[in-house]
Amino acid sequence: LNPYTVSVFGKKYGLDYIVAVATKKEYKRQGYMRRLLDKILIDMNSEKVPFTYLIPANKDYYLPFDFAFVARKNVYDVDLSSFKKSVLRCVKPECKEACEILRFINNEVSKDNDVYTYRDMHYFERELKEISSEDGFINIYREGDDIVAYESFWGLEKIELKERIVSSSIAKREYGKENIMVRITDVAEFLSNFRSSKDIDIIIKINDNIVEAQNAYFRVQMGKDFANIVKIPDAKDSAFVEFDIADFTAWIFGYNDDVNFNIVNFVDKSIAKDS
């Protein structure tokens, strides 16, 4: 697990990025990976951690644990040849240039994302070490004094693009292959960051076969400047919307509207959909 600072609607969380889960050949097929991941997810819930995330080498390893894709890889169709380019191989953390790079990246990634990895100096220092360890480098493109694009490359045998971020003033961000998977570990904590343009009061039922603490009903009350999320024993005769946790994750992150859900006891089902 690698810790990162993640901004969720402006609130900063220390969340764990799962780098890899692997089992030695002689220990495979004995349930070690499942028990380890189950324990991690349950512990995160007890610590009110809203979610964990990863970039999968093989999505099929993580689908049984109710991870869901929430984002695609950023792609930019842009010609940067007309901009002033600097190639950086040794950037000292906390120098002026490092601060400029961080400011540029955070400004760009926050424009269209309510949830994003917040780059602080600790993050950048670790990033520089990773790039350096594989003989990598950074490209910075400027228009006048302003950074308009950032690229990082790495690879001992074959140089590969690690990340590219381009200013929205010169290029429109497009989306490539599915990239990031998320596993919500505390529904109530995650939803507490949301706001609604109109007041809502609705019950949702989450089906979670791993994190039993959130295999439950939640009453969601929300408005422009408040959110109150409470777990309740049952819905009784009240209307509610039911999701499996993976479907809820893909839907609430705005990645996929076409997920499975059940609308129960609503006279007018459009009310549930609008909420």
Give the predicted meaning of each segment.
Residues 27, 44-45:
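Hydrophobic pocket-lining residues that define ligand/cofactor binding sites across diverse proteins
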Residues 201-251:
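C-terminal hydrophobic structural anchor segments
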Residues 233-275:
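C-terminal interaction segments
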